[in-house]
Amino acid sequence: MNRRKFISGVTSAFLLSISSQLMASDTSETEHKSHDMSKMPENWTKDEQIAMLIYPGFTALDLIGPQYMFAGLMGAKVHIVSETLKPITSDTNITIIPTTTYDKVPDNLSVLFIPGGGESVIKALSNEKLMNFVRKKGSKAKFITSTCTGSLILAGAGLLNGYKATSHWVARDALSAGGAIPIDERVVIDRNRITGAGVTAGIDLGLTVVSLLRDNLYAQTLQLLAEYAPKPPFNAGTPITAPKEAVEIITSMFGNYTKNAQNTVKKALI
């Protein structure tokens, strides 16, 4: 066994252990003998089916933030979906193993979730099998959701036409290529479309979706469990608050991204 496979195996075991503690998939079958559950309302256990798409080069934190919240839905089943069951490597070289494939995802989805990425999103928009999966499941899902540039994939699938939506700030304007109305907000809800802004907004999106599937108290309880009370060391999380030099660096790095994304979204719609 080589070093990479060993690390992958240890990581998978660790994540499996964490997910079981956080009431992840098939939580209705999990006994929490070490926890006193008597204070929890009886109606807090349901049976949602949640599909979270992954593809080569997706942004890991786009997935992990919402997944933590979705995994806390007692009784829900969270599917990590890709074309095959082969491990998928993220933008930061974290390897995630899918739990199911496109053809085995239930039709009665409570949530379809799409993470974003950089150039990987451009490639995903040109992937016919991936886009057909998003179109098919998105046409029936109760909630259609995304974080960061994942909304570009929704736009390319024709699922945001006429809807308000957001994305990472460097790509937000590209949403208009799919008929969406770009909105500068951390989380945007328009009917059953729920989109999050860049990367870390996935945590906020996850809590928002949880509150809609269950109730505000459930979401607040998960927020407390996660101790999600961010106080970043810098106030540079948006182009408005960040130093001019930082904005110029990022804008220069992604100067052609919006145009490329717009063109690719348009092609995906044809």
Residue spans of the language-model regions?
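Conserved Rossmann-fold dehydrogenase catalytic segment
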Residues: 184-197, 227-228, 239
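A conserved active-site-flanking secondary-structure segment within enzyme catalytic domains
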Residues: 160-187
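Structural detector of well-ordered beta-strand residues that form the stable sheet scaffold
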Residues: 144-145, 166, 183, 194
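Flexible glycine/proline-enriched surface loops and loop-helix/loop-strand junctions
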Residues: 117, 188-192, 203
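Residues at secondary-structure transition points
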Residues: 125-128, 166, 197
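Short acidic alpha-helix initiation/capping motifs at coil-to-helix transition points
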Residues: 198-202
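Extended, subdomain-level signal for the structured scaffold at the beginning of enzyme domains
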Residues: 2-144, 152-155, 172-173, 182, ...
